From Swiss-Prot:
HAMAP family: Arg_tRNA_synth (MF_00123). NCBIfam families: argS. It catalyses: tRNA(Arg) + L-arginine + ATP = L-arginyl-tRNA(Arg) + AMP + diphosphate. One of its GO terms (biological process) is arginyl-tRNA aminoacylation. It comes from Yersinia pseudotuberculosis serotype O:3 (strain YPIII). Belongs to the class-I aminoacyl-tRNA synthetase family. SMART domains: Arg_tRNA_synt_N (SM01016), DALR_1 (SM00836). The gene is argS. This is Arginine--tRNA ligase.
Amino acid sequence: MNIQALLSDKVSQALIAAGAPADCEAQVRQSAKAQFGDYQANGVMAVAKKLGMQPRQLAERVVELLDLTGIASKIEIAGPGFINIFLDRQWVAEKVEYALTAPKLGVTPVEPQTIVVDYSAPNVAKQMHVGHLRSTIIGDAAVRTLAFLGHNVIRANHVGDWGTQFGMLIAYLEKMQNENASDMGLSDLELFYQQAKKTYDEDEEFALRARAYVVKLQSGDEYCRQMWRKLVDITMAQNQVAYDRLNVTLTKDDVMGESLYNAMLPEIVADLKAKGLAVESEGATVVYLDEYKNKDGEPMGVIIQKKDGGYLYTTTDIACAKYRYETLGADRILYYIDSRQHQHLMQAWTIVRKAGYVPESVPLEHHMFGMMLGKDGKPFKTRSGGTVKLSDLLDEAVERAGKLIAEKNPDMPADELKQVINAVGIGAVKYADLSKSRTTDYIFDWDNMLALDGNTAPYMQYAYTRVVSVFRRAGVDESSLTLPLVITEDREAALATRLLQFEEIITTVAREGTPHVMCSYLYDLAGLFSSFYEHCQILNAESEEIRQSRLKLAMLTAKTLKQGLDTLGIQTVERM
């Protein structure tokens, strides 16, 4: 049930009937304050200006023509021409009843699209670090949200599994196997990479072999391909441990590494030349883009093939977009990559559009994000200035959550305690990130993220347990709530209306890729439930009808909190 869309449609019809053009916008918004109703239509001012009318006069005409019978109990004009809409409580009660029993909380089924989501993208033979966290969890929240709405979502883990460094890595893996050291299983990928680099820099014979292996690997040599595959498999097995701990939906089946596009690169360069988009320049192949100028005001050159024949990231990204449209059948392609890559992506996509590889009807969207900073406002590092490994960060999160939870639950069974600690620790790290606007940098702060009050995972998880505890205490389930829902109190109405806005919120999150909007909604919902719980007797209500009505509101609150948190990849617990 999308109330905003319903009201927008009704107000637009009234505006058109009042003489507005067919493309006019009703500008219906959720009201910020209860005194202005539940929704506000703000489109009258812009339309009145076009029609040369007084806004108030047009607003009066629109209200006369606006048919909200059975939906609104009152419509008011405020100020110069704002239209305030107060929803009818009987109508709200009926919609809550529907949401309670309907699939997906009554969210309207969408016309399914095939949507490719590019996220996470770790590198082979390197451990995942905190720099991979934002792409991984924000991207996964998008995947979960789009899948919930009914879209066919293709997860694309654009793993860095190709490049000149693989000659060095294959040579070093071979050296270890010859020394019977392969049982280390690359347990410390970071150390493996560092030692390979050190050997490459210090041993000329090793470096020659490494360079030869690059050529062999790129020409399809079977031995080199086997060694390369082993490196990829070991890395992704370790990354899977991180994904599972993070409650992220990525698996090995979602890996679409850079190597996937290798065979396409020569064809793309040849095609861009044939189309007159790419030219030779000092031995390299370059596409000059009028849309981007260098410091001298000349079209910027984007190299797609170096003079030694090697390809660049841009070439791979062009191939990647082409593949996602032509082979995967994408209707929409989302990239969760940090903001520093924006110009690079825009240049690649400009070439993609000019070449006709992806039509304009298929959006290419860079859902960029800022950096994760320490309390000092600088990039988040270890005390010694090194990169923080993701596994170390998650270990610390669980350890800190353990102290917090064990202290408050000395009698909880060990298995349940472990599960709660894990859900709270991992949830705290994820929610702290997801609750901030992704476009900004954010400060990583343990104390804030593990706080039991404020917009944090522990608070939200506790809010959920508080709601479900009502049903434990009452000993009732949904099937026993047979009386019709009635709304008699303002706090009931406020909670019920907010519950019905779930579809508006999840639709916005799916469109914009903004999980912080869902976090804000859930936090607001938890606050409204808290106020309702404190001021409206539930189990000891004055009548059985009111008792059941309030239990139904509590039930839909629990379902909405759980579903909303699930779209963020945050686990709920029954007790805390």
